[in-house]
Amino acid sequence: MMILVTGGARSGKSRHAEALIGDSSQVLYIATSQILDDEMAARIEHHRQGRPEHWRTVERWQHLDELIHADINPNEVVLLECVTTMVTNLLFDYGGDKDPDEWDYQAMEQAINAEIQSLIAACQRCPAKVVLVTNEVGMGIVPESRLARHFRDIAGRVNQQLAAAANEVWLVVSGIGVKIK
């Protein structure tokens, strides 16, 4: 079963995703964040301390289909947090050292879509419950920069693909989860 949990920043989506897991004794937590500065290091440490000790944590943001596969114990639950951070990391990885104004966003989106399609296929083959957390990016103003506009567009299309493939979709607003699929 594939479940997508979406919502704005600080909406309570992580808490809601963890509630969907319940008291499962076998959890694979896939963290997609990278430590790029002190503020992000503090955020990651805060999340680490909040997780139960028995959760198995893997910090990775590429080739996630290799972690989510048909050999996973059906009693295990997979929690991937967060898809939007994964998309951000992929964008900057594909962009390399080039100036973002020189990036080939169409080629980048194709590469990201290939990664997302592999992730979806893995989730659908996986016998365990897979919960994906993502940010709802399309409810704000039109971003000022080219990079931010492309990011919003790519992340929005990724979310649409995930929602279409998911068995359940939850939108979390102000700490309240609303099942929309």
From Swiss-Prot:
EC number per UniProt: 2.7.1.156, 2.7.7.62
Residues the record marks as active site: H47
EC main group: transferase
Biological pathway: Cofactor biosynthesis; adenosylcobalamin biosynthesis; adenosylcobalamin from cob(II)yrinate a,c-diamide: step 5/7; Cofactor biosynthesis; adenosylcobalamin biosynthesis; adenosylcobalamin from cob(II)yrinate a,c-diamide: step 6/7
Residues that, per the record, bind GTP: 7-14, 31-33, 48-51, 59, 81
InterPro entries: CobU/CobP, P-loop_NTPase
GO molecular function: adenosylcobinamide kinase activity; ATP binding; cobinamide phosphate guanylyltransferase activity; GTP binding
Enzymatic reactions: adenosylcob(III)inamide + GTP = adenosylcob(III)inamide phosphate + GDP + H(+); adenosylcob(III)inamide + ATP = adenosylcob(III)inamide phosphate + ADP + H(+); adenosylcob(III)inamide phosphate + GTP + H(+) = adenosylcob(III)inamide-GDP + diphosphate
GO terms under biological process: cobalamin biosynthetic process; DNA damage response; porphyrin-containing compound biosynthetic process
Record keywords: ATP-binding, Cobalamin biosynthesis, GTP-binding, Kinase, Nucleotide-binding, Porphyrin biosynthesis, Transferase
Induction: By cobinamide.
Function: Catalyzes ATP-dependent phosphorylation of adenosylcobinamide and addition of GMP to adenosylcobinamide phosphate.
Subunit-structure text: Homodimer.
Family: Belongs to the CobU/CobP family.
UniProt name for this protein: Bifunctional adenosylcobalamin biosynthesis protein CobU
